[in-house]
Regions:
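Generic non-transmembrane alpha-helical segments
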Residues: 141-152, 209, 248-259
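Short acidic/polar active-site loop segments enriched in Thr and Asp
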Residues: 89-90, 197, 216
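His/Asp/Glu-rich mid-to-C-terminal helical/loop segments that flank catalytic regions of hydrolases
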Residues: 227-264
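Active-site rim beta-loop-alpha module in soluble metabolic enzymes
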Residues: 132-195
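Flexible, glycine/charged-enriched surface loops at secondary-structure junctions
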Residues: 43-48, 150-162, 256-264
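Conserved active-site and cofactor/substrate-binding residues in soluble primary-metabolism enzymes
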Residues: 27-31, 71-78, 86, 133, ...
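Zn-dependent metallopeptidase/amidohydrolase metal-coordination segment
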Residues: 204-238
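Metabolite-binding pocket within alpha/beta catalytic cores that recognizes anionic/polar moieties
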Residues: 1-145
């Protein structure tokens, strides 16, 4: 393994440095990668291994990569680590989530400014009292991009704030089946009282790697639904359409490319 790890081709994502752009979009689902890559110019698949499907094209003349991370913090952290080894330094996670705060409804976009570290991966990167925060410039670019596609209508809005990252999907959606359900429900209640916007599984790990490796990271999530709104008797949408989040991420990369050029 040492000889493979020391080589130029990355051990898990199987890319070479020349395969990867400075700017990277990180969906979780490998099947979503070709859809995102269609929004780039001249995109081609450069690697595929395990949960990692990797395409690279150009945007505004700059090389941009799309790489899936699979589900959860460990595989997401591996992807970011190896993409950084190939020269990437700017990452936008795009994914789906379950709404938490009552102002978030299904179909809304959530731009993550930070993530609750309710998972285990970040403990390998950050002290327990260090926050998993997104890069301000990436958050700002996502905000400006979201403004182009959003309205004040339910299911077509955007929000910026703290998201919840977890390890167990079913621990959240079916806590009654867990022997530690009291702890799960108590933490969930605390996160709701703190105004956490939505729950997902990768942002904290991606942000933590970015902090430690000095890379710029952010995330934009589609809220699929919000069970808390349903509990409160409020109207809610249910959707699996991630097209707005994809467009937001691509437009944010455009903004960052332009500003990086202007500030070079």
């Amino acid at each position: 393994m040492a000889s493979i790890m020391d080589g130029e081709r990355q051990f898990h994502i199987r890319t070479l440095p020349e395969d990867v752009g400075r700017y990277v979009i990180l969906p979780g689902d490998p099947n979503r990668v070709p859809k995102i890559a269609q929004m780039l110019d001249d995109a081609v698949q450069v690697a595929q291994n395990r949960e990692y499907n990797v395409y690279t094209g150009t945007l505004e003349g700059e090389k941009v990569t799309v790489c899936s991370t699979g589900i959860g913090g460990p595989s997401a952290a591996i992807a970011v680590e190896e993409l950084i080894k190939c020269g990437a330094d700017t990452f936008i996670r795009i994914g789906t989530s379950g709404g938490m705060d009552l102002k978030v409804s299904g179909g809304d976009l959530v731009i993550a400014s930070a993530a609750v570290r309710g998972e285990g991966t970040t403990a390998e990167y950050l002290p327990v009292d260090y926050p998993a925060v997104a890069d301000f410039l990436v958050v700002d670019a996502l905000k400006r991009a979201a403004e182009f596609t959003s309205t004040n209508e339910i299911g077509n809005r955007y929000h910026i704030g703290v998201v919840h990252s977890k390890d167990s999907f079913y621990g959240e959606v079916e806590p009654e089946n867990s022997p530690v359900k009291e702890n799960i429900n108590s933490r969930w209640k605390s996160y709701l009282e703190c105004g956490c916007l939505t729950s997902e599984m990768e942002c904290a790990a991606i942000f933590a790697v970015g902090i430690v490796r000095r890379a710029r990271c952010g995330g934009v999530l589609t809220a699929l639904w919000n069970v808390e709104r349903s509990k409160a008797g409020l109207p809610d949408n249910i959707t699996d359409d991630s097209s707005r989040a994809i467009r937001c991420a691509v437009d944010a990369i455009r903004i960052l490319i332009k500003e990086d050029r202007d500030n070079f």
